[in-house]
From Swiss-Prot:
This is Ribosomal protein L11 methyltransferase. Methylates ribosomal protein L11. Its main location: cytoplasm. It is found in: Cytoplasm. GO terms for molecular function: protein-lysine N-methyltransferase activity. It comes from Pseudoalteromonas translucida (strain TAC 125). The gene is prmA. Keywords: Cytoplasm, Methyltransferase, S-adenosyl-L-methionine, Transferase. It catalyses: L-lysyl-[protein] + 3 S-adenosyl-L-methionine = N(6),N(6),N(6)-trimethyl-L-lysyl-[protein] + 3 S-adenosyl-L-homocysteine + 3 H(+).
Amino acid sequence: MAWIQIRINANADNADLISDLLVEAGSASVTFIDAKDTPIYEPKIGTVQFWADTTVIGLFDANHDMDSVVALLNADKSVAQNLTYKIEQLEDKDWEREWMDNFHPIQFGKRLWICPSWRDIPDPDAVNVLLDPGLAFGTGTHATTALCLKWLESQDLTGKTVVDFGCGSGILGIAAIKLGAERMIGIDIDPQALEASLDNANRNGVADKLEVYLPENQPEFSADIVVANILAQPLRELHSVILGLLKPGGKIAMSGILTEQAQSVADVYAPFIELDDIAIEGDWTRVSGTKKA
């Protein structure tokens, strides 16, 4: 299917309004990107923060009347005042297929492979996790996921109960089961993540060992292992909740933490866990340790 897109120069004050206008004009999707490489590391929970210079991209069917889109934008005085845009015809290609073609099997440690469900397995004798990310985050390609997978691969998980706090696609939990865990509990605030986790667990033949819950529905339990690949701020703010899932002597690994945030996370957990050395991969880190008795 062919598409046409409009790229609009925006700022933190009007990006959301421009997005609403594009949706009103019939946009199939709206994307925000940083126009000047000014990273926003971590907005407050429940908020959306835009860059000072933001590019808003609206995607439309190739036959859409783009003059009507521009007219709608110009009709709003606050947008029209400094409206700068570019309309581009996109190449007709199968974008989903292109993404699939660029997602390859990845090895973590000595035993573990994460394999797209549509690819051949490189090593049938290895611990293989077949993954179809679907609508949830987690393919193994991001440094934070990789840091957690490498840590799990290094642990003795045989017969253990493992919690994945913020389970996303289920990649960490399924890997834990494949590495020997007896019971896996995935917790996420997004129902789509729970659905993706269950789908991937079925694909890997481990659904009988996986339980998934929204936070408000989770039962009481005490786990041997907790992994939490979320963000530094919720890791700090929810430390009592996360630690409450872990039995004394249990092990925890946390990521989604930028290098400059690692010490602040470690400081919050230090009274409660014996910390390991902080692991670093690129701009990201992993904080791990063992819960004190």
